[in-house]
Amino acid sequence: MYVRRLRRERSNQAIADYLGSNGYTDALEAFRKEADMPNEIERKYGGLLEKKWTSVIRLQKKVMELEAKLSEAEKEAIEGAPTKAKRTPTDWIPRPPEKFALAGHRATVTRVVFHPVFSMMASASEDATIKIWDFETGEYERTLKGHTDSVQDLAFDSHGKLLASCSSDLSIKLWDFQQTFECVKTMHGHDHNVSSVSFVPAGDYLLSASRDKTIKMWEVATGYCVKTFTGHREWVRMVRVNVDGSLMASCSNDHSVRVWQTNSKECKAELREHENTVECIAWAPESAAAAINEAAGADNKKGAHQGPFLASGSRDKTIRVWDVNSGLCLFTLVGHDNWVRGIVFHPGGKYMLSASDDKTLRIWDLRNKRCMKTLYAHSHFCTSLDMHKSHPYVISGSVDTTVKVWECR
């Protein structure tokens, strides 16, 4: 009885403080009269109602997260998937709910990338800015300003000393990531929207792709364009360099993927099977070779494909995996309900991850050529994703203007 009365008195004091501090004087007088309260409110009750409400919201959020994790565990138990205790890092995949949902951009997030060394990530946006975040704490670090139109792509060099960005303002910028975080070089040369950038692994050259249908190679030290690759008949959407820097791949609105030798202007292969614009490409790591060969039905001892292997995602809603040497499409992954906007191979080599305009991230089992998990990631189109090479994290960006961090387990 006493405890109940004490709780009621404290609640009344907290409500009275809230009414008084927000200027609801008439309501406060009526409440005091109704509750038979003294005129003075003890100081310890200041802001108590709001604190209680915040605590309730925080607890509700925690309950929802725990329910999502419990649901995930139950689903795995029913489907017979490996439990957390039995999974090794090569099997870790992103699981709901997201660890962080980061807000700050004022328009569509176009690209998200991890820093190769530090616990940082960068996001580019149509609001013409680049934002830097700490992916382990979810803290906002800084904003890089300099572009005057939508920032389309980002790329760190292999040591993380430089960040390259490209924009609809026709420029490419290099940003110092050792000390100042300032723009140290701006390069001009494309005649239209610059849609993609990618460093050659050694870090001395940078490649860029544009709506002007060309790919350009730039010397990082001088900022001079040293080569221009021509061949695509429409907007070049993305360019990516393979692990040893000898080959680069590009994809285009002309429905094709082209593979080029970086030390010449020669087009090594033109890969044509997509039925719409090819939005994204990703080189397969060596760790994925066994899974890709098994999926392709090749005998690993006798008729195995040697690679290198390349994946491409398209507006035709499919992902295709190619043997670059033979030019063959080895298999196709079908499951997305809208454009495929981003793809990345799992470092362990067993899986591929994709982002799509159907608002999902999907995890694909390469050996079995099937979607093994779907994350309903964003409230609008998913535009980009990245997976860290050594830490258990995936990041995604969206038209909903948020960046999400997903923990792998």
Swiss-Prot record:
Q: Which CDD domains match?
A: WD40 (cd00200)
Keyword Cell division appears in the UniProt entry: yes
A Gene Ontology BP annotation from the UniProt entry? cell division
Q: What is the annotated localization of this protein?
A: Cytoplasm, Cytoskeleton; Cytoplasm, Cytoskeleton, Microtubule organizing center, Centrosome
Against Pfam families, the record matches this protein to: LisH_PAC1 (PF24951), WD40 (PF00400)
Q: Which UniProt keywords apply?
A: Cell cycle, Cell division, Coiled coil, Cytoplasm, Cytoskeleton, Microtubule, Mitosis, Repeat, Transport, WD repeat
Recorded GO molecular functions are: dynein complex binding
Checking PROSITE patterns in the record gives:
LISH (PS50896), WD_REPEATS_1 (PS00678), WD_REPEATS_2 (PS50082), WD_REPEATS_REGION (PS50294)
Where along the sequence do coiled-coil regions lie?
Answer: 54-81
GO cellular component annotations, sorted alphabetically? centrosome; cytoplasm; microtubule; microtubule associated complex
Q: Where are the WD repeats?
A: 104-145, 146-185, 189-228, 231-270, 273-332, 335-374, 377-409
Q: Does the keyword Disulfide bond apply?
A: no
Q: Which residues form the LisH domain?
A: 7-39
Name the domain of life.
Answer: Eukaryota
Comment block on domains:
Dimerization mediated by the LisH domain may be required to activate dynein.
Classification via HAMAP family: lis1
Return the similarity comment: Belongs to the WD repeat LIS1/nudF family.
Q: In UniProt terms, what function does this protein have?
A: Positively regulates the activity of the minus-end directed microtubule motor protein dynein. May enhance dynein-mediated microtubule sliding by targeting dynein to the microtubule plus end. Required for several dynein- and microtubule-dependent processes.
Mind telling me what this protein is named? Answer: Lissencephaly-1 homolog
Q: Which organism is it from?
A: Aedes aegypti
